[in-house]
UniProtKB/Swiss-Prot annotation:
Family: Belongs to the universal ribosomal protein uL6 family.
Gene Ontology terms: cellular component: cytosolic large ribosomal subunit
GO BP term, example: cytoplasmic translation
Record function comment: This protein binds to the 23S rRNA, and is important in its secondary structure. It is located near the subunit interface in the base of the L7/L12 stalk, and near the tRNA binding site of the peptidyltransferase center.
Annotated keywords: Ribonucleoprotein, Ribosomal protein, RNA-binding, rRNA-binding
Annotated gene: rplF
Tagged with keyword rRNA-binding: yes
Organism the protein comes from: Synechococcus sp. (strain CC9311)
GO molecular function: rRNA binding; structural constituent of ribosome
UniProt xrefs under PANTHER family: 60S/50S RIBOSOMAL PROTEIN L6/L9, LARGE RIBOSOMAL SUBUNIT PROTEIN UL6M
Pfam families: Ribosomal_L6
Protein name: Large ribosomal subunit protein uL6
Length: 179
């Protein structure tokens, strides 16, 4: 049995969980998330917690057990607290701003790059260089942050580009020059 999967998921007071077969719907103060879990697991609500269990002893069921428990736990945390990821833009003339809901990034190209958020994702910008991606779905927040970082990944010589907050860039030495 999975060590992660066997732990029950506590349900906070303001969160409502609806189970119908393998479809899980979680409603909370931050929004609503729906997900259909793969076959091989069963999801049950016991008191104020959710228990995920494998339906058989097959390897595929046991593999999905911990995954499904973590997916449901991330849904519960997402609708109650939400998720956010911070990015930093490093470099002269590189900046970001929000126009409406769209994020406009000037990252050294001849044109500004526009990023349109999917439903449930919001962008906020502080000091023109710090971007925060926030939402209820952990996977979607991470994917959008990765898309923004991919516009101009940090380069190893001067560290210019878009990086996650707290990310360490492995720096390289420049050319040593002819002697």
């Amino acid at each position: 049995m999975s060590r992660i999967g066997k732990n029950p998921i506590p349900i906070p007071d303001k969160v409502n969980v609806t189970l119908s077969g393998l479809a899980v719907t979680v409603k909370g103060p931050k929004g609503e998330l729906k997900r259909t879990l793969p076959s091989g697991v069963s999801v049950n609500q016991v008191d104020n917690s959710i228990v995920v269990a494998p339906t058989s002893t097959k390897r595929s069921s046991r593999e999905r057990h911990g995954l499904c428990r973590t997916l449901v736990a991330n849904m519960v945390i997402g609708v109650s607290q939400g998720y956010s990821k911070k990015l930093e833009i490093v470099g002269v003339g590189s900046r970001a701003q929000v126009k409406g809901k769209t994020l406009v990034v000037s990252a050294g190209y001849s044109h500004p790059v526009e990023v349109v958020p999917p439903e449930g994702i919001t962008f906020t910008v502080e000091n023109n260089t710090n971007v925060t991606v926030s939402g209820t779905d952990k996977e979607l927040v991470g994917n959008e942050a990765a898309k923004i970082r991919a516009i101009r990944p940090p380069e190893p010589y001067k560290g210019k580009g878009i990086k996650y907050a707290g990310e360490r860039i492995l720096r390289k030495a420049g050319k040593s020059g002819k002697k």
